[in-house]
Each structure stands twice: as C-alpha cells, then as structure tokens.
C-alpha cells in the first residue's frame, strides 16, 4: 500500500524530444511518462496517485532533504534540479531526452538521460525506479543484466543502463554520491556508445 503524502504539485518540468516526454517534479521525480509513445501506457503515472501499488515514478532522492530548486539550462531543453540536504550537501540532476545526428539523420530515441553530480558536502542519495503497467494496475516483471535492468511492460520492454552499482538501484539503498553518475532509461537495446559519452 502507498504511504500518505502531500497532494501533488503541478509545478512540473517537461523533458522531451518529439518521440519521448516526461514530467518531472521539483524534487527530481519523474511523475508522468507514457511509453513507448505519447498515447501509450503511462509507466510513470504517479501524477494520478495510483492506489493499487507504490509505484509509477522514477526518483532521485537525497537523504535529509531540505530544499530544491529547478530551472532549464539557458537556451536548452535540459532540466536542472538541485537537491539540498540539511547537512550542507547538494546534488545536481540533469534530465533530458537526447536528440542528435546519427548516420546522417536526426535521431530522437524514446529515452531519458539522467546525469547526477555531487555539488557540495557528502550527499547520500537513493534511486527508486518503479514503473507500473496496465495503466497503473500491475507491477511489471523485472529482469537483471550485468549493468542494466529491464521491465516487461504490456507492449514494450523498458531498460535502465547505469554506471551506479545495480544492487544499489535494485534494492533502493542509499549511497554516497561522490562522482558523476548516469542513468539512461529507454528501449531494451544496447547503447550505441559508452555510457559516460552517451550521457553528455
């Protein structure tokens, strides 16, 4: 069952690339995204507060949260969220949907890139990735690879590729964010280049 929480805030950032879109709240939580297209099943549907399961979101949380700020990087569609803890620690979360030239064509995959970076102190973060399927009614089956995990949705397989140790993501354990880290969420395919290069 879900734990009680404050009513949802509709002051949301939008990330997209004409193939993919997501709504991100002020605390760096993806609360809405339909997959694999805009008219698809909302794997991230926390905006509607589904009651059947505690899921439908993709959050990057800082322990001892104190405050946050959110804005777009100048002249870009890159959403920057800074999370502060009450001990002087801070992290930056950059969210964007990539769009680039590939084989002489503009490539805009169904994909979200999340780049995490420590800014100050010794911030401890927790990643919670809990997609749902069938319009929030069911928890999808999960399968684990060497540096990725995938969820079997109704019409599509969702894959997270990351340089964060997978047990920390799978078990939602807090960890010290002491270096830049990358989370790439998209189709169940191998990335065309290295994770760090792809996340830039």
Region locations from a protein language model:
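Beta-sandwich/jelly-roll carbohydrate-recognition scaffolds of carbohydrate-active enzymes
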Residues: 2-200
